[in-house]
Amino acid sequence: MVTREDFFPGEAKLIRQMFDLGLDWLHLRKPGSGEDDYRALLMELSPYERSRTVLHEHYHLAPELAAGGIHANSRHPFPFKPTGERSEAKFADERGETAFPDMSHSGPTAAYSGPTAAYSGPTAAMLSVSCHSLEELSAHKAKFDYLFLSPIFDSISKKGYSGRFTREQLLEARDNGLIDKKIIALGGITAGNIPIIRELGFGGVAVLGSVWFSPSPVTSFEELRHSL
């Protein structure tokens, strides 16, 4: 789950309800946000929920608040240096289910150095990155625990942001081993297109618009979760 860009009343409550319903990872993405507001939202989450939250900004808060990971993107390309080759992230559901997917926090440990802190060892963060082409995906795949590829379908949250890949391109990437369990589909994801995502070999999905811009975000999340 990727958050809305803005902060809004009741956001933490909705997030916590989604965790209760089986949310695996939260990507906290608030472009241009102030550190105080960012920290305040994190502090409204439980320690467990923070351990499953990946930061897109204010990376130095990750070790301080025991966040689950940090995410590189075009706004913050490489504020850290991934160390060594990253093996495939572990996709094991801690609730004993066979849901698609769940990146267990017991997956590969990370060592990175952010702007103010070193962070390594058994409680270290997951490292992820956004990719918008198959070439980017190939270049970054070995360096990160998992990678977003987008937009797969026409974006719901960004009007006019159309799917970038043909079905044939994605099937070829799957058959060549480029798309596998480390790759997360983003962009236009709904419960209705989950079967296509499965066929294309993705390890999971990241959603934003189909949940947050619906009349009932928690209900929409639950429907999506049941389709996995």
Task: Outline where the language-model segments fall.
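Long, intrinsically disordered low-complexity tandem-repeat segments
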Residues: H105-P122
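Aromatic (phenylalanine/tyrosine) cluster motif
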Residues: F78-F80, F91, F100, Y112, ...
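A short acidic, helix-capping loop that chelates divalent metal ions and anchors anionic groups
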Residues: F153-K159
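Conserved N-terminal beta1-alpha1 strand-loop-helix module at the mouth
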Residues: M1-H71, R75-P77, A124-F144, F165, ...
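Glycine-rich S-adenosyl-L-methionine
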Residues: T166-E172
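Cationic, low-complexity basic patches in intrinsically disordered or flexible, solvent-exposed regions
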Residues: P82, R86, F91, R95
